[in-house]
Amino acid sequence: VFGMRSCDATGLAFLERFFAGRSFEDDSVLARIRASLRMTMACDHPGPDCFCVCCDGGPWLTEGFDLQFADFGSRLLVDVGTGKGAAAVAAAPMLFQAAEPEAIEERARRLAEVDARFERRSYVAAGTKRISLGQVPIEKWEQWAEDCQCCGGCCFVCPTCSCFTVND
């Protein structure tokens, strides 16, 4: 899968953990996920409502990718994250060359700039952080459960969630 954003790759990792769960395992889904080569694009322009920092999903990944590309205009800087990524680079040596030290410095500078621009105060980010830290009172969950239509819409909004009934 080429070009998925950091948040998408993180969502895929959450789904992989779900489908390899304690009480349910979907071998077909797991085989497809694990056979994929995850080539992500580092995010230079997170949106105002993005919440990838709340689930360690970016804007640039440190894990969960095989190859991660950073767009430097006329060239791409590639980080290798796994053995599968290293094998892909080795299989196409004409497409890759070692990064110059200046490119590594540029990547660090850009990452700091992107991190500084990130909207950490978005209501989605604040809510996600409260949920992940266990700061939502049980009464609130009970209230939401009463209103829940079991449509799964929340799962379409956030791939880190898997709050649905699995029937086969």
Residue ranges and their predicted role:
Residues 1-134, 138-141, 159:
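Iron-sulfur-associated redox domains of electron-transfer enzymes in respiratory
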Residues 142-161:
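Cysteine-centered iron-sulfur cluster-binding motifs in ferredoxin-type domains/subunits
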Residues 162-168:
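Active/binding-pocket-proximal capping segment
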